[in-house]
Swiss-Prot record:
The gene is rpoC1. It comes from Nostoc sp. (strain PCC 7120 / SAG 25.82 / UTEX 2576). It comes from the Bacteria. This is DNA-directed RNA polymerase subunit gamma. In cyanobacteria the RNAP catalytic core is composed of 2 alpha, 1 beta, 1 beta', 1 gamma and 1 omega subunit. When a sigma factor is associated with the core the holoenzyme is formed, which can initiate transcription. GO terms for molecular function: DNA binding; DNA-directed RNA polymerase activity; magnesium ion binding; zinc ion binding.
């Protein structure tokens, strides 16, 4: 076994590649001196042998063997021939995984403009050439000629566009016997673009732009600054403008655009293979037409088709008709693979599935405390499995990991007791996408619950921007003691009451909570069932309400010896009754107090409703805990 290679990356940078660099990516020299890497045939695999065709899109000589330690012709098999290059087929005997990173290239018979830099917003080619995008497109797609050098012609200017008729007229003048015209050069297509870009002296251009900017104003100044910024970036990165026109295009490794055989013997293939095949076919046809000196109009048409094929490969649908495959589905180009939510960056590089994490729908947990969340049992046993196994072995209930896993899979009752011990004091982190601010991920103490949904305290919903209409949340388990301590001290929901953006409380009662509190404490003169009854304690009132002896809003007297506050002053007696033993009963608006002869309070009954009793008791219990 070879040690695993670990490549450390600081960052990934996207830039322009020179034709030489693209060749370096794909070119390799075999021990016999043969240089391989250029893909020249559109074939993929042989339909009889099911082996890759040589010099095709899946060529084993270019990309490496299709089977581990086996060459194309079968002369060398087994790992003992490692590193040998077969004399017959030229395939290096190595692992097949090299087909995931070895690249090839296609040498184009005519230059082709890169569609990103031509049709992107902004169009860097048109900015650099200081020409309207419409004019640049006319040149690239063979609709107009462009003057590359006006020579001594007074009627022509550099970068002037000419129609077919205008060019024929000038051509007649050039080739007439008494012609005075000299040094007139006109081009069309990406070749003309390549020449125009190569003629730009970036340093000189930047210098003259800086001088112009000093005196320019308004729209013109903004345009000059935009152009200068692009030129400065080219100078800073060491890229050349002519690299925006490609003479060589890379062929990505075959295992990244696979071709697999289905059950019925048919093949399913990546769209990229179809797009590459179109490019190779048109490129080969163009090379053949140039060889046989075909008429200019035919060659030009083929060049335009090659440009369109490369456009479709890089960014299908950016310009012109979208290339479609079977059942009129647009083919996925290189741009489609890397951009968007399902693209390589967001799907595979930035967002990865991690261990010790789960995901489920959230439901409201009204009985939870603010720092708690309800974690489904089957999710908790999976997330905390290593901790549970460790605890089972340490307690002597099982001897090894295999036995512990068997015990867990049988849902043994003892496992749940161990799980309860493990999760006690072990916070978990809940995250709801999109995490737009730091309160989008918070820590909670898990409480085991039945069912498959995560229970969430309603007060923390505004921080997560969560509601219970089908939202999902991810659970992450902090493993190390440091991360657990950090989660508990910094991320616990009860420590995140204020919004980091505004400094105002983000945990505020709303909706059901406000409505419920209002309904419990509201007055309803129509509620008369059980009104005026006396009760010895708060619990008796709640019990009577639960047994439907009294209405929620009926006013009753309940014994309560603590302090009483009301929204209106309640110090003036309404009625005072003196008893035979000298004690007296004082009736206030909201309470009834019995005092002895010395004025000491014997008992106090408050005039309230069962709803207010329930509300008051809930707050008292919350404060006491």
């Amino acid at each position: 076994m070879r040690p695993a290679q670990t490549n450390q990356f600081d960052y990934v940078k996207i830039g322009l590649a020179s034709p030489e660099r693209i060749r370096q990516w794909g070119e390799r020299t075999l021990p016999n001196g043969q240089v391989v890497g250029e893909v020249t045939k559109p074939e993929t695999i042989n339909y009889r042998t099911l082996k890759p065709e040589m010099d095709g899109l899946f060529c084993e000589r270019i990309f490496g063997p299709a089977k581990d330690w086996e060459c194309h012709c079968g002369k060398y098999k087994r790992v003992r021939h490692r590193g040998i290059v077969c004399e017959r087929c030229g395939v290096e005997v190595t692992e097949s995984r090299v087909r995931r990173h070895r690249m090839g290239y296609i040498k184009l018979a005519a230059p082709v403009a890169h569609v990103w830099y031509l049709k992107g917003i902004p169009s860097y080619i048109s900015i650099l050439l200081d020409m309207p995008l419409r004019d640049v497109e006319q040149i690239v797609y063979f609709n107009s000629y462009v003057v590359l050098s006006p020579g001594n012609a007074e009627t022509l200017t550099y970068k002037q566009l000419l129609s077919e008729d205008q060019w024929l007229e000038i051509e007649d003048q050039i080739y007439s016997e008494d012609s005075q015209l000299q040094g007139v050069e006109v081009g069309i297509g990406a070749e003309a673009l390549l020449r125009l870009l190569a003629d730009i002296n970036l340093e000189q251009e930047a210098e003259s732009l800086r001088e112009e900017i000093g005196s320019a104003k308004g729209q013109k100044r903004a345009k000059l600054i935009k152009r200068l910024r692009v030129i400065d970036n080219f100078i800073a990165t060491g890229s050349k403008p002519e690299w925006m026109v490609m003479t060589v295009i890379p062929v990505i490794p075959p295992d990244l655009r696979p071709m697999v055989q289905l059950d019925g013997g048919r093949f399913a293939t990546s769209d990229l293979n179809d797009l590459y095949r179109r490019v190779i076919n048109r490129n080969n046809r163009l090379a053949r037409l140039q060889e046989i000196l075909a008429p200019e109009i035919i060659v030009r048409n083929e060049k335009r088709m090659l440009q369109e094929a490369v456009d479709a490969l890089i960014d299908n649908g950016r310009r012109g008709r979208t290339v479609v495959g079977a059942n009129n589905r647009p083919l996925k180009s290189l741009s489609d693979i890397i951009e968007g939510k399902q693209g390589r960056f967001r799907q595979n590089l930035l967002g990865k599935r991690v261990d010790y994490s789960g995901r489920s729908v959230i439901v409201v947990g009204p009985k939870l405390k603010i720092h708690q969340c309800g974690l489904p049992r089957e999710m908790a046993i999976e997330l905390f499995q290593p901790f549970v196994i460790n605890r089972l072995i340490r307690s002597g209930m099982v001897n090894n990991i295999k036995a512990a896993k068997k015990l867990i899979s049988r849902n043994d009752p003892s496992v749940w007791d161990v799980l309860e011990e493990v999760i006690e004091g072990h916070p978990v982190m809940l995250n709801r996408a999109p995490t737009l601010h730091r309160l989008g991920i918070q820590a909670f103490e898990p409480i085991l619950v039945e069912g498959r949904a995560i229970q969430l305290h309603p007060l923390v919903c505004p921080a997560f921007n969560a509601d219970f209409d089908g939202d999902q949340m991810a659970v992450h388990v902090p493993l190390s003691l440091e991360s657990q301590a950090e989660a508990r001290l910094l991320m616990l929901a009860s420590n995140n009451i204020l919004s980091p953006a505004t400094g105002r409380p983000i945990i505020t009662p709303s909706q059901d909570m406000v409505l419920g509190a209002y309904y419990l404490t509201a007055e309803n003169p129509g509620a008369t069932k059980g009104a005026g009854k006396y009760f010895a304690s708060l619990d008796d009132v709640i019990m009577a309400f639960q047994q439907e002896q009294i209405d929620l809003h009926a006013y009753v007297y309940v014994r309560f010896d603590g302090d009483v506050e009301s929204d209106q002053p309640d110090t003036e007696p309404v009625k005072v009754t003196t008893n035979e033993d000298g004690s007296r009963t004082v009736l206030y608006k909201y309470r009834r107090v019995r005092e002895d002869a010395q004025g000491n309070v014997i008992s106090q009954y408050i005039y309230t409703t069962p709803g207010r009793v329930i509300y008051n008791k809930a707050i008292q219990e919350a404060l006491a805990s």
